[in-house]
């Protein structure tokens, strides 16, 4: 651990160091700009790990960081362009005693332009951390309720189950939104 307490002119400070180790690849293939980006990433991760920490650059972690950043950018773009890339699907709910369809769980899906279908386990946390879950959740509920109304013309007792994020509950008027739909 590197940590130094300095007191001078009635001013006290403790200094710590966060460092990273970045193996330098062949510059002719990588280029200086990419090395600067990887260095910035490495130092950011070292600081996130806490004081007096050294992070050794891992290519796999960097590629995952780039993937997350790209998916997050695509999510922003989709929300700003009428939710292009999002879709809803229905998971049937059956009453097996009567062998009857009683409803469906409505699920949200997202297809990335670059990566194809993205797992909800990956994109929903990104929606939550970016705050995009609020407008996306509103869109999703509108779509689910509209679809349910159409299905009810054929199956009057049809019901839908909608999953709601904790972020939607704590940071939006999700109940009011549902009632207004």
Residue ranges, per PLM feature:
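Alpha-helical scaffold within the catalytic cores of cyclic-nucleotide enzymes
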Residues: 1-11, 38-40, 140-150
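Catalytic strand-loop-helix junctions within cyclic-nucleotide turnover domains
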Residues: 10-11, 16-35, 60-64, 92-98, ...
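Catalytic core regions of nucleotide second-messenger enzymes
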Residues: 2-19, 47, 116, 152-158
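Catalytic core of bacterial c-di-GMP phosphodiesterases, primarily the EAL and HD-GYP domains
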Residues: 16, 23, 27, 98-105, ...
């Amino acid at each position: 651990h590197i940590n130094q307490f300095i007191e001078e002119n009635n001013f006290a400070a403790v200094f710590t160091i966060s460092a990273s180790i970045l193996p330098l690849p062949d510059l002719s293939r990588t280029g200086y700009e990419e090395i600067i980006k990887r260095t910035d990433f490495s130092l950011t991760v070292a600081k996130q790990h806490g004081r007096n920490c050294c992070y050794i650059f891992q290519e796999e972690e960097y590629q995952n960081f780039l993937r997350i950043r790209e998916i997050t950018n695509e999510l922003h773009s989709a929300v700003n362009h009428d939710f292009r890339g999002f879709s809803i699907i229905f998971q049937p709910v059956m009453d097996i005693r009567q062998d009857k369809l009683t409803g469906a769980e409505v699920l949200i899906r997202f297809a990335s332009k670059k990566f194809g279908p993205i797992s909800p386990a990956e994109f929903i946390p990104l929606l939550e951390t970016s705050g995009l879950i609020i407008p996306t959740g509103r869109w999703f509920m509108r779509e689910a309720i509209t679809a349910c109304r159409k299905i009810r013309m054929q199956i009057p007792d049809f019901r839908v189950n909608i999953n709601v994020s904790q972020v939607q509950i704590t940071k939006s008027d999700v109940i009011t939104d549902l009632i207004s739909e």
